[in-house]
Amino acid sequence: MQTILVLTDFSNVALRAAQYAIHLAGQLHSRRILLFNAYQSLEPVSNVPVTPELPIIQANPDELYKESIMQLDKLRDLLEPTAAGITIDTLSEDDILEEAVRKLISKEQVDLVVAGLADKSNLEKFLVGSHSIRVMESCNYPLVIVPEDARITPLEKVLLAVDFETLRRGKALAGLVEILNSIHAELYVVNVASDEGYSSETKEDIQHLHQLLDKYHPSFNYVEDTNVVNSINEFAAEHDISMIIAVHEKKGLLATIFQKSVSKQLAWNSNVPLLILPA
């Protein structure tokens, strides 16, 4: 975990995420923080399709770039006193955030992305969502989402929210092991399911997960409940969890519309930092 990419729009929420990233970098022994701001000089009016009657608004790209760089420099100056041994670089680009991040992952050899998430009303979540949520939906890399009211504390207790079907279909376990080897935290494994019991395939998954994680001496917890998100958040509160780890499986358009993503709901509804691993 040498390089951490921190996304910022210079809001208080983004500042909190950047401060958390500095703290996290120390525990992960990361050597570099890259502060990144994506701005758009071309932006459609009211987020509707461009037509001859409703043209796009074009801002002065040079002015936007200068302002972005100035704000990034201020942010770096604010963070550096608490970032001993960590290099803080800055980067600003005129691009769509999700596209820019995808390019930077390989170009800058990024190991982890950190973004803030502001609390929103249910209507705002439905209508506009969040940059962080959109990045999560498109990501193929580890992403930490930091709620605006998250506490900045050492990673002493970590909760791994397990969905066996998602783990079985994906390749997240290797990334999970790398994270666990880095943070050296007390591990709680939580699976929330209804009382229908486990299939023979799931029982094999459980056995495999025990074998994989036993060296971390985790606490395995199997909870019967139909509300997965509430159960996980309640468990996190009761056990003073420092971070929740969840595996996110990207879905097609129809699945996105008709299925609820537990990882997305956790991002919206938890006040604990959430580490998303791609399935």
Task: Name each model feature, range by range.
Residues 121-122, 167, 252-254:
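Short glycine-rich, flexible loops that bind phosphorylated cofactors or substrates
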Residues 1, 109-111, 141, 155, ...:
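Local beta-strand N-terminus motif with an aromatic residue
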Residues 1-56, 157-222, 238-241, 269:
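Small/aliphatic-rich secondary-structure junction motif
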Residues 23, 40, 77-113, 214-264, ...:
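Structural beta-alpha unit
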Residues 128-131, 203-206, 258-263:
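Charged helix-capping and loop-helix junction motifs
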Residues 146-154:
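Flexible loop/hinge segments that line or gate small-molecule binding clefts
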